[in-house]
Amino acid sequence: MPSASHDQIELQEIAPGYSSRFTDWGGITVAFEKAHAGQDASAMVRGLPDDRCQAPHWGFLFSGKIVVHFDDHTETIEGGQAYYIAPGHAIEFLEDSEALEFTPTAALEQTFAAIRRNSAAANSSDV
């Protein structure tokens, strides 16, 4: 049975200001995530269908405040809440946030690929 504490999973930076400790357990990614206040992930998921993350996420927000934007509505998650985020969303961090999240790995890899592409493009235009 896989198990791990926060410090046993390698820290990886997905994009500037967005770091995560994540590992795959049988097709599900387990991630301890941190994001800074003011970060709007909308630009990071451009290029995905509808320019939104298509991965579902289940998790627990330890601290912070997150706004989840869908095409037809917006939802808010606050520290101390468990959550489910359906596919087709973009996330904005209103406060420094820390979460434990579970996501199907294949869907998450598509999202990470878009984030890395968009981050690289943004960094090359800054030069």
Question: What function would you assign to each model-found segment?
Answer:
Residues 42-44, 78-80, 110-114:
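A short, polar/proline- and glycine-enriched secondary-structure boundary/capping micro-motif
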Residues 51-68:
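Short, conserved beta-strand element in jelly-roll/cupin
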Residues 105-125:
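Short peripheral tails and domain-boundary helices/loops at the edges of structured domains
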Residues 87-112:
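Ligand-binding loop in jelly-roll beta-barrel domains
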Residues 1-42, 48-50, 116, 123-127:
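A short, N-terminal "cap"/entry segment at the start of jelly-roll beta-barrel domains
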Residues 26, 69-73, 94-96:
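Short strand-coil-strand connectors
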Residues 70-89:
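Short acidic-glycine-tyrosine-enriched beta hairpin
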Residues 22, 65-67, 90:
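Residue-level detector of beta-strand face positions
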